[in-house]
């Protein structure tokens, strides 16, 4: 890795900051929503109540001796952080720890009636079945009239913005983008991305998924298009091995999304059928590596995952959390070169992300100045700006 100055690791110890608000407000709200969405029994509800107290007022308590992943979490820093306030350990670590403890509270890992039951599934399905999803899927029919390269770019736009990619993933905002004082897309390496997926020769794409539901659907549409038009020969979709960060995609969520597409009419149904066929013949593979839920940056990835990424023509990492893990969850100066902080990555990498946390690299100085002048610091966390960054 190039010799770049170290930036402070983000912790959530300062009231009024975005990370502090996540631990102090968002996590308790998630616990209350989980208890409301699913009729858990008294044991699970007591455990959720205890977690609410612990995550806001208590300290990191190690997993029970019999936990199936205790050794893994010990290697990931559990014992080193034991006894410390959740606000005093790295923010990425405390967030990941919260979701591991939530699953422990609802009996997700233990033998019994709640084993394997996703506590976030009601919210995921509600989004996938929402009328807005019907409208977006119906709008796919209009893409059939576009040339292939325009269709591909529209689908990339949809994958970038997820459920903010309104009106069927159309690129209708492009003209406004070019004249806006502060563009929604604060960094755009999309031409470099397409140069890696030009089909000469066609190779493999790794896509590290972010959210399920209406955000996973456009990821799957993009993969289906790239396969159908020979831009890639196969795709590997990395999902989470268990529920994580409320909406992160698991294998079950992929199957739900494919079923949703297949049941639709028109172009959406055709995409769904192609995806089913690709899963069946191996052109689309699913991976659920344990490190996908690690509280660590990708710089610490194990060798087998490193090999997966090294063998791909391009690895696309979706979403804010994957970006934090890709560049390191630190207060980087926004103009820190993206290529420098990702130099360790074993192959070409592309980040597609809407901005929902303080971590940002690779901005032009004039872009940072314009953003700060127009919005103060809100642009970092509001989700109204996005980026496409590529390192080859």
Functional labels for PLM-detected ranges:
Residues 214-236:
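Histidine-anchored nucleotide/phosphate-binding helix
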Residues 227, 240-243:
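N-terminal beta1-alpha1-beta2 submodule of the flavodoxin-like/Rossmannoid cofactor-binding fold
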Residues 1-191, 195-202, 385-392:
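Non-catalytic accessory regions outside enzyme or core folds
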Residues 89-93, 208-217, 242-244, 320-325:
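Gly/Ser/Thr-rich loops at beta-strand to alpha-helix junctions
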Residues 21, 92, 187, 216-220, ...:
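Conserved structured core elements
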């Amino acid at each position: 890795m190039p010799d770049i100055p170290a930036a402070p690791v983000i912790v959530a110890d300062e009231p009024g900051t975005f990370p502090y608000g996540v631990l102090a407000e968002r996590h308790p709200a998630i616990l209350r929503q989980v208890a409301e969405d699913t009729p858990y029994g008294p044991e699970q509800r007591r455990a959720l109540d205890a977690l609410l107290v612990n995550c806001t007022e208590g300290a990191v308590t190690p997993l029970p001796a019999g936990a199936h992943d205790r050794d893994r979490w010990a290697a990931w820093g559990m014992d080193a952080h034991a006894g410390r306030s959740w606000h005093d350990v790295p923010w990425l670590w405390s967030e990941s720890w919260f979701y591991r403890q939530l699953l422990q509270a609802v009996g997700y890992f233990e033998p019994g009636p709640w084993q394997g039951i996703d506590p976030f599934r009601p919210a995921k399905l509600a989004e996938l079945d929402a009328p807005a999803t019907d409208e977006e899927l119906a709008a796919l029919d209009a893409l059939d009239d576009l040339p292939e390269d325009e269709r591909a770019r529209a689908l990339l736009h949809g994958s970038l913005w997820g459920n903010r990619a309104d009106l069927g993933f159309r690129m209708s905002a492009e003209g406004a983008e070019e004249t806006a004082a502060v563009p929604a897309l604060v960094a755009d390496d999309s031409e470099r991305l397409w140069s890696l997926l030009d089909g000469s020769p066609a190779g493999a794409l790794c896509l590290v998924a972010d959210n399920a539901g209406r955000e996973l659907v456009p990821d799957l549409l993009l993969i289906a298009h790239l396969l159908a038009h020979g831009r890639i020969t196969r795709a590997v979709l990395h999902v989470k091995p268990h529920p994580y960060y409320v909406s992160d995609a698991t294998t079950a969520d992929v199957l739900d999304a494919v079923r949703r597409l297949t049941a639709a009419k028109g172009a959406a149904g055709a995409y769904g059928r192609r995806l089913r066929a690709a899963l069946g013949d191996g052109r689309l593979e699913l991976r659920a590596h344990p490190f996908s839920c690690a509280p660590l940056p990708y710089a610490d990835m194990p060798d087998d995952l490193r090999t997966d990424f090294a063998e791909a023509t391009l690895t696309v990492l979706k979403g804010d959390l994957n970006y934090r893990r890709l560049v390191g969850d630190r207060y980087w100066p926004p103009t820190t070169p993206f290529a420098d902080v990702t130099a360790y990555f074993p192959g070409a990498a592309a980040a597609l992300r809407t901005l929902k946390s303080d971590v940002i690299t690779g901005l032009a100085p004039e872009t940072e100045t314009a953003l700060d002048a127009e919005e103060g610091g809100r642009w970092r966390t509001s989700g109204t700006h996005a980026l496409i960054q590529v390192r080859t």
